[in-house]
Structure formats: C-alpha cells, structure tokens
Amino acid sequence: PVIFAEYAMDTADACHELGLKTVAVTAGYMHPGPAKEFFAKMDAANVDLKAFTDDFYFKVCGGRLQPVLDTLVYVAHETSCWLEITTLLIPGRNDSDTELEQLAAWCMKELGPDVPLHFSAFHPDYKLLDVTATPKATLQRARRIAMDAGLRYVYTGNVHDRDGGSTHCPGCGRPVIERDWYKI
C-alpha cells in the first residue's frame, strides 16, 4: 500500500536483487513526486479505479477522482510498469450505464485499448452490509460496454464467468487463455 511506500520500495529493491518481479496493488491516490519514485521500482501495477465520479470518491473514499486518473495516465505513459485497472462494481453506487460508458471512454482515450480492465463483483462485508452482491449480469454488462468502447482486454472477477475471465484475441475473438476460476 502507498501508505507504506518506503517499505514497498525497499521490498521491491530486495526482490529485484533476487530476480523477482514486483506488483503494486494500489488505490493510485499519490502525489506526482512520490509516484515517480514508487512506480520506478515496480514491474507492474494494478490500480483500483473505484468509480468514475468525483462525488463517489468524495463521499465514499474521502478523496477525489482526478489524482487517481493522473496516476493512471502517468503509469501508462511515463513508466515501463505494466498497468492493469480494477473497478469493484457496487450495485446502485457506481454501476450505471452512463458511468461505465464514461469510464470506458476515458480509458480508451487516455490509456489506449490495450490496458486490461477488470470489473469485480462486490460482496456485502464490513460497513456496506445493506448493499447486495453484484449480479454476474452487471459485470457482463460492464464488460460489454467497455469492449464496445474499444477496450480489448476486459475481464469480470469475483464471480464464476469463464468467458469474462478468459483472454480473447482482439482480432477474431477466440479464447487465447481460458480461465475457469483459478484453473488455466
């Protein structure tokens, strides 16, 4: 986590000395200065794009959307870090067609068609016990919206969806890597 950025960077250095690769799984809410140093040490990053409205980021996360978008653009265009994005879809909170269309259009325009995007299912735990789990159909709808926007590698997660979890050739649509839960 970025809150332990120095520790993560030291750990990344130690991993690299042993020939190991490093992956940062982060909310991406970083000041540009530390982000430069942090992502220079990482081989890959999975950034949580929690929603595509500033209102959600402010009310639910206590932050703002723009710094996360800035981090995504920075990692995609200014580093050698492999980038993937994950959005946890929470029913009624960040899963409207409009928001998903805006998210997909932004990713296509700012990051390009080849940055993988994962839509994960929410499960009611901890503080959001009053919200139902994300239906598989919602994830499939989000995936279709993103693919229709031109994104080539869009996945569903936290549900059993063999097609949505597999990698398909963007040219012919055939499965290249078939995943079934944790089986490849």
Language-model-derived ranges and their functions:
Residues P1-T134:
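Conserved AdoMet/S-adenosylmethionine-binding subsite of the radical SAM
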Residues R93-I184:
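Auxiliary Fe-S-binding modules of radical SAM enzymes
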